[in-house]
């Protein structure tokens, strides 16, 4: 009887874990829209733009007795397919490349974290945003698409959540 109770408890916990991972509180790994900041040290203006990144829940496990066995590799939500987009930073001095490239997620999957290409979490040396300055360095996105031949007209506000058209050629 005790073995049957243990088996029943194990089944309930297993099924409950699956239900919890598929619920609305934990969306699965998928491309989502995110607003990022682009800046270069020599260029005076930082701009925000919207692109797609990989984000969401990946099933993982933690050992009950971590000291007895080596850690289990934890999957992360990462790119399956991607392309690169680019934007032109306005106001860069001559001799400084004003183009900034960034990945655009086409599809995502749960897989190992590759430190060369992926932010695997943990502490950061700097925030992923425009550096605070005495003057306003972050600008609203321009009204026209950014390509290698167009330059945005700086806006007046500090931040924007409006999408910035990007060149993804």
From Swiss-Prot:
Location of this chain's protein in the cell: Secreted
Q: Where is the signal peptide?
A: 1-20
Listed under GO cellular component are: cytoplasm; extracellular space
Q: Does the keyword Signal apply?
A: yes
**Which CDD domains does this chain map to?**
GHB_like (cd00069)
Region of interest called Disordered, as start-end residue ranges on this chain: 131-169
Sequence ranges of Low complexity compositional bias: 145-158
Read off the SMART domains from this record.
GHB (SM00068)
Positions of glycan attachment: 33
Which residue pairs form cystines in this protein?
Answer: 29-77, 43-92, 46-130, 54-108, 58-110, 113-120
Q: What are the record keywords, sorted?
A: Disulfide bond, Glycoprotein, Hormone, Secreted, Signal
What GO biological process, any one, is recorded here? Answer: G protein-coupled receptor signaling pathway
> So which domain of life are we looking at?
Eukaryota
* Gene3D superfamilies, A to Z: Cystine-knot cytokines (2.10.90.10)
Q: Name one GO molecular function term.
A: hormone activity
Q: What does this protein do?
A: Promotes spermatogenesis and ovulation by stimulating the testes and ovaries to synthesize steroids.
- State the family it belongs to: Belongs to the glycoprotein hormones subunit beta family.
The subunit field of the Swiss-Prot or TrEMBL record says: Heterodimer of a common alpha chain and a unique beta chain which confers biological specificity to thyrotropin, lutropin, follitropin and gonadotropin.
Name used for this protein in its record:
Lutropin/choriogonadotropin subunit beta
């Amino acid at each position: 009887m005790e073995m049957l109770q243990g088996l029943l408890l194990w089944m309930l916990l297993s099924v409950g874990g699956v239900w919890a991972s598929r619920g609305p509180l934990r969306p699965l790994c998928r491309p989502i829209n995110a607003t990022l900041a682009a800046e270069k040290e020599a260029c005076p203006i930082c701009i925000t733009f919207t692109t797609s990144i990989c984000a969401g829940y990946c099933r993982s496990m933690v050992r009950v007795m971590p000291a007895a066995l080596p850690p289990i590799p934890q999957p992360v939500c990462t790119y399956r397919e991607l392309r690169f987009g680019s934007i032109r930073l306005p106001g860069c001095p001559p001799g400084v490349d004003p183009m900034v490239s960034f990945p655009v997620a086409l599809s995502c999957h749960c897989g190992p974290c590759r430190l060369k290409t992926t932010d695997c979490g943990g502490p950061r040396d700097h925030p992923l945003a425009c550096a605070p300055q005495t003057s306003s360095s972050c600008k609203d996105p321009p009204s026209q698409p950014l390509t290698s031949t167009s330059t945005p007209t700086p806006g007046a506000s500090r931040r924007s959540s409006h999408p910035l058209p990007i060149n993804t050629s």
